[in-house]
């Protein structure tokens, strides 16, 4: 690590501590040239996989898009924003845990449907009707029947 005071390349770690519930490492460093001390923080960089759309176009994972889709389905439903954030974090963790560099929109959509099914059945039906392109009332009935099983 470069010294912020003299730009020397050689520094040594004097002290390391976990901070932020163990999600960060705080390090005290000392420059071996000018002997100044400074603090650095390290955080793991969690990379989300790219998303492959149905038309084969690949795009970066967009958390805002995921959130807005879920919030649209949950509109005027009695679900707390904390529950929505927990569901979003669960979906993101699941996607990262696949270890894949790319995931399909189908996989993301299925994870959203699973999360909504646990949060609110009405929101689940709303999302499923758009995601699965329900054509008529019969398809709504079939999905509701599956929910009741």
UniProtKB/Swiss-Prot annotation:
This is Transcriptional repressor NrdR. It comes from the Bacteria. The keyword Metal-binding applies. Binds 1 zinc ion. The keyword Secreted does not apply. It holds the Pfam family Zn_ribbon_NrdR. PANTHER family: TRANSCRIPTIONAL REPRESSOR NRDR. A zinc finger (unnamed) spans 3-34. Residues 49-139 form the ATP-cone domain. One of its GO terms (molecular function) is DNA binding. Negatively regulates transcription of bacterial ribonucleotide reductase nrd genes and operons by binding to NrdR-boxes. Belongs to the NrdR family. It comes from Pectobacterium carotovorum subsp. carotovorum (strain PC1). Keywords: ATP-binding, DNA-binding, Metal-binding, Nucleotide-binding, Repressor, Transcription, Transcription regulation, Zinc, Zinc-finger. One of its GO terms (biological process) is negative regulation of DNA-templated transcription. Its cofactor is Zn(2+).
